[in-house]
Amino acid sequence: MKKIFYTSVFLLLTLFCGCDLLDIKPVNSMLPKSVEDFESVLLGGYPRENFFINTDLATDNVYANLSATSAVTKSYEPWFVWAATHQYNEAEDTYWKQLYSSVFYANTVLDEFAGKTPTTEEKALFETVRGEAYALRAYCYFYLVNLYAENYADENMDKPGVPMPLSASDVHQNTQNNVRVSVGKVWEQIEKDLDEASKDLVGKESKGKYRFDYIALQAFKARVYLFTGKYKEAIEAASYVIDAKSLFDMNEIQSYLDGLDKISNAFSYTYGFIDTDYRNEVLFFVGGKGNGNPYYYYKTRFKPTEELLNLCKRDPGVVDYRRYIFESNADPGSADYAEQGPTVYRMFATQQSDCYYIGLKLSEAYVTRAEAYARTGEKDLAIEDLNRLLVTRIKKTDYVALDKADFTAETALQRVLEERRVELAFDGGMRWFDLRRLGKPGIRHAYENGQVHTLNQGDLRYVLQIPLSEQLNSPNMPINPR
């Protein structure tokens, strides 16, 4: 019966969450009443569409293999060449649409729960659902402000952020002439929501990796604090996650490799990396099916760069198991080597479960804490965190701990950022967000007809354009400069 109700509520809310941008209209039909009903509403709000993976096309983690013969998905091209708008042929902006739909679901729950006191029997579930709603709203606004507004920095706090409805009724009243609140206000609200979520979720039982629990929430808080330069708080939140979970020792992958004629057979279309016990590091799955990403087909146009792969191949005599996430192991002497190329993305394949995109994982807490240490003059502690990570990534017979004495404060930070790049490649759009906060470096992409496209240092295109549909609905809203 509950499943039938959930389906009904999901279809009901889909009717008024599937409209353009913030244009969400209520309908009179069966409405949720109990805490369990609103739990079902909230579950319908968790994103089940990809809202970040295309951003990797715009980074230094991806190149175009022009020898590939597979058909090119034309909607990928504006991202790769940094077009003035990422919307292909004026198609709707699914990122904007998905994120604001999820905000609406969260707001619906928070509106209903505001001022209510649950019964003793309801209290635990009531607080869990409310805490998840706060966490989900913060998560969505984190993505919205990092996609459509300037990065967090003192000089950007008063610049236009994104529309920020905090009630479901706000959406109904403001489908026209929406207002972009400032960047600073959005980040302030994200932190407020995370604080409220923490109060509700602490001590609550996890309900699965497709929902926020307290540990996943702390991992997300560590991310937010890192982005906002609150390094002490980032260290504290990341430490909670690190103390609560254990890293997967990739030496266990050796059993996949022993006795194989080709290493590529270990992580092929049948077995992605996520099918190993590596999945135990995942704290939160999000978005659509991970094996639908653009980078894991052998003959696809867009592939991981060799620069990324080479960060896992620093020493030819050392086996870093992470190389197998990005290395195609194609035979250079084969007729189709040029088309296959040296790289492929093996994280996802045709799993039967656990196949959504990685939203948060344990290793992010390690590289976040290491970066926070490095930025606060604790370079030795940063290297210690890297060693804790690398001993689980490198073959035991090859592993040699990094020597703290070999690093200056500057080189320690650089190494941390390199390990972060490897660990978080293709996870939740993090590379694009990191590039934005790390000075918006210049990037060059070679594409068809020998043309080289350039994203300049500090380029305005590091901020996505406000969707055309929103521009039409809110003609007075400032758009992002180009």
Annotate the PLM regions.
Residues 19-65, 312-317, 397, 410, ...:
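Membrane-proximal, proline-rich intrinsically disordered regions
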Residues 28-32, 58-68, 149-162, 203-291, ...:
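Short, surface-exposed recognition loops and adjoining beta-strand edges that mediate ligand/DNA contacts
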Residues 39, 228-229, 235-361, 411-432, ...:
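Extended ligand-binding clefts on enzyme/binding-domain cores
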Residues 76-148, 181, 194-203, 352-357, ...:
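Conserved, well-structured interaction surfaces
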